[in-house]
Amino acid sequence: MKIPQPFLPLRAESQNYEHTIHVIGRDYTVGADGMLRSIRSQGVELLAAPVRIVAVEDGEPSHWDENYPENEAESFIQRRSDEEIIVCGAKQSERFIVDSCTRIGYDGGVDIDLKLMPRGRTVAQVFGVADAKPMRFRLDRLWLEIPLRAEAATLFHMFPNSVLSLADGTERPMGTMSASGAVPAQDAAMPFKALLWLGNEERGLGWYAESDRSWQPEDPEKAIELVRDGEQLILRLRLLDSQPETWTADPADGVYAYHPVTFCFGVQATPVKPFPQQPYIHNAFHIDCGAKVKGNYIDVLAGRYDELKEKGVTTLILHEKWNKCQNWFELSEFTAHQLHTIVDECHKRGIKVLPYFGYELSTMAPQWSEWQDKVKMVDEKGAMEGGWWRVPFQRDYVVCYHSEYEALFLNGMEKLMDEFHIDGVYLDSITFPRLCYSTEHGCGWYDPQGRLHGSYCLKTLRRMFRRLYEIVQSRGGEINVHSFGYLNFLTIPYIHQNWYGENLQFDRMKGDTEDLDLDYFRAEYLGRNMGAPVEFIAYENRPLWTFEQALACSVLHGILPRPNEIHHPLELMSRVWKVFGAFPIEQSEWMPYWTNNARADHEKVRISYYRYTDLSGAPQLLAFAVNISAKPVEKVTVSFPEPVVQAREMLEGRDVGLTFGLDGYSCRILFAK
């Protein structure tokens, strides 16, 4: 296959029983035992020590045979191609074997299978010409530990959201923004997670698993632990805290009675691809999202295309009502006419068009009766989920892409791009890893007691987005995705821009006056530590929460909010776009508040900026001074390490110097030189 840009064909080097696989921006080294011993992102090592298996057998710590020059069990490359390299490895203790299969994809995703089994007998022992030591195959513990450099893992994100149990007996409570933030200063534990990312503002390591099949933690609420050990932060996965439930025979007979137990998971270093030097990839206007409009879009937009152009819009995003039948690919006569008209009018003015598609099947779809049972996502009771209501009157129910709907979706996207010449697609939460229990299309699994458990189709979503990326990228298009409170780093390689922030809106729209949670913002909304640019969602509820306040919160972190109303928010962002367009962002260095030496003499003010050096060697700054609190700051003086002496407030168009006031949750956009 042809590797899509910006990715590169995989390369592998083998030396001293180790194999280093080079992925764009990252390097993974698999050791002689099949375990990852080095993970580098942007040239920086993430691991403090090799990944290890910690086991206790028959009451004693396991000791693994590490003498690979003599034991003839060193890891090897099973297969290699431009898009995937597979490395197999093995570990053996006195009683047990762990075989591993590590698959590294060109996007940097590393799928790992571990197979645990009793140690076998030699040929001589089988034929009775050598003694076979009597042995009890009892396994008391099997943990996987990933030792990270503590300085490389200061932030975290987890999905699904939950409380964190802390070492002092307290809990970090669950809330709308508790899924991300600063890694606790003390040891912490959590239930099983499908996605867990540990990193900082520049890079990190994601861990993932579609289910906890075969896991037996002593306490399910503490299946995963974050353990501090000096300069290390150890990610501990408690795979087994007791003998596997499927091993029911007497341990003395385990050599043949116990069958292999498999654990499936993976890791992915971030950023997943190079972050663009110009992260503001378009000036997007999103119609009918949050700020709802009456009538059909063809009528709402009539006579306004020139206005969009004049205000700097380069991308028009159509929300769900563009399509009479929610998310369906076969368009009605009116919908086809509407889309053709909007695309034609926009293209005349150099504006791209991205229509909405979501994650549901509508009762209005002519194929509802044919597809509903085949593609529905079901809960543990077998019931469909969802039921979104919209006009024309219909209900929309959640689909599972680990079904025939994957192919249906991809074929539909390809045909729409070719027939209507759309410039990509806006996808609402399609990357969300939903817990599905439908064994009819391959989700879910039964434990030894016959209980049904759900699974997350992470690999299916990655595969689907990989193919969608090929479809859209080859036609010069863009994939724009809305995500709500989660970071699916498996799909981010195939996304051009993410739209985050809806969960934060719930609190702000109701009048929340807490200081901006900077740790949360840096963990989840930056984009730079993941590899794809971000825009910020802003739903106004004046006077409690305004678009200006959303601008302040986001611009401090190098991202911009997306306007969703043709008057005020768009008029404001039109001015912001002009400011950003006039500054040489692509030739500038991003200097965020958490690393720069800019100072403010008020504790609630933070400063980030872009620094450009002109041909004479003089610095020019596009700076953002932000009040992170709800209370006004009457007077603050800011300073920069660069020799700048004057500052102009770019939205007001006047010189303000380096001393000024700031309303609650407000910002000054300054040009300083």
Region annotations inferred by a language model:
Residues 17, 22-26, 31-61, 92, ...:
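Beta-strand-rich recognition/accessory modules
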Residues 401-491, 513:
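Active-site neighborhood of glycoside hydrolase catalytic domains
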Residues 299-323, 419-420:
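Catalytic domains of carbohydrate-active enzymes, especially glycoside hydrolases
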Residues 1, 6, 107, 111-226, ...:
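Polysaccharide-binding surfaces and accessory modules of carbohydrate-active proteins
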Residues 293, 297-298, 339, 344, ...:
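Active-site-adjacent "subsite" loops/lids of carbohydrate-active enzymes
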Residues 457, 462-650, 666:
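Active-site-proximal substrate-binding groove within the catalytic cores of carbohydrate-active enzymes
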Residues 2-9, 13-94, 101, 150-172:
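Acidic-aromatic substrate-binding/catalytic surfaces of carbohydrate-active enzymes
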Residues 658-673:
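C-terminal beta-strand-rich structural cap/linker in extracellular carbohydrate-active enzymes
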